């Protein structure tokens, strides 16, 4: 490699690192990502838009697609709320709204290729893009092969969706809510936002957060729940469902629907307390360094839940869950 090329690459790398440091400093000072975009301190860069001419602009603020042409949906949103739900219409429809009229480069970009509908926030390299709200509606009888939806700064709600394989959703600073969706596998993750799953039916369910809270009330064969500092609340765990739940400093609250089966429940915390409501006997293995066991326990090794709880300093409290 020529010396001039090497020098140019080093300079480019240093500029990128400097820009990342400036953005990080602003975020630490309490400036939101959306504020950085609006004041021009942050440029939106969506890699695939820069090289793929097949993306089209949502010129009128709304688009519709035949459900026969769409088998998968890939959504990436930056700032603003997202509502993704089933409705009474016969088309897959999307609409975006902003507080002011959008310039061409600020409009949503979409691409439909080989059955995959890809949606992106705007064109590549935009600055001063206003916050935009997105509504995406699919027919009630439409089933996707898979759905992958992510948002950076803004709340996202998914409701009444049917997915053959995996429904994957993620948020950075916004709250995430998934209601009454049916799929084989549901994966939800957030950094500082909360995750709420209500009324969903799936074979396997996985939820992870860093500081956001987790709330789950769903039907599943397997559940994996994990948070660093956020609290976890898992209610009405169905029979035969195996649960693996872990938190570092957050509190775990869990209730089982019944105690007439040999389901496996594992809960692991460091300093967080564990509240457990089992309507009957259980085979409990409680391992702790300095925590206490409180409440009434009916110990049994027969046809009842096998519960393993491990804490460092967190207590285990048996009985009805606190609000």
Describe the function of each predicted region.
Residues 3, 58, 77-81, 245, ...:
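Amphipathic repeat-derived elements
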Residues 179-181, 186-187, 195-206, 211-323:
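Short, surface-exposed interaction patches in beta-rich subdomains
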């Amino acid at each position: 490699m020529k010396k001039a090329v090497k020098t140019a690459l080093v300079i480019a790398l240093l500029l990128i690192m400097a820009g990342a440091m400036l953005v990080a400093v602003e975020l630490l000072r309490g400036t939101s990502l959306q504020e950085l975009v609006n004041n021009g301190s942050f440029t939106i860069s969506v890699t695939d838009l820069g090289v793929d001419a097949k993306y089209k602009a949502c010129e009128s603020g709304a688009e519709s697609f035949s459900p026969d042409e769409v088998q998968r949906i890939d959504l990436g949103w930056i700032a603003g709320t997202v509502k993704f739900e089933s409705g009474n219409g016969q088309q897959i429809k999307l609409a975006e709204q902003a507080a002011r009229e959008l310039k061409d480069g600020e409009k949503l970009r979409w691409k439909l290729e080989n059955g995959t509908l890809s949606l992106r926030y705007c064109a590549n390299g935009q600055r001063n893009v206003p916050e935009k709200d997105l509504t995406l509606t699919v027919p009630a009888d439409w089933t996707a092969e898979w759905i992958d939806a992510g948002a950076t700064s803004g709340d996202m709600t998914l409701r009444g969706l049917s997915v053959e394989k995996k429904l994957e959703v993620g948020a950075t600073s916004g709250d995430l809510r998934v209601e009454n969706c049916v799929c084989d596998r549901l994966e939800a993750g957030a950094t500082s936002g909360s995750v709420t799953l209500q009324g969903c039916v799936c074979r396997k369910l996985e939820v992870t957060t860093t500081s956001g809270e987790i709330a789950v009330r769903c039907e599943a064969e397997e559940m994996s729940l994990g948070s660093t500092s956020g609290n976890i609340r898992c209610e009405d765990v169905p029979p035969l469902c195996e649960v693996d739940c872990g938190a570092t400093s957050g509190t775990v609250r869990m209730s089982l629907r019944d105690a007439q089966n040999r389901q496996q429940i594992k809960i692991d915390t460091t300093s967080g307390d564990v509240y457990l409501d089992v309507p009957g006997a259980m085979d409990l293995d409680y391992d702790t360094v300095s925590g206490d066991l409180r409440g009434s326990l009916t110990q049994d090794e027969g046809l009842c839940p096998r519960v393993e709880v491990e804490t460092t300093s967190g207590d285990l409290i048996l009985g009805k869950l606190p609000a």
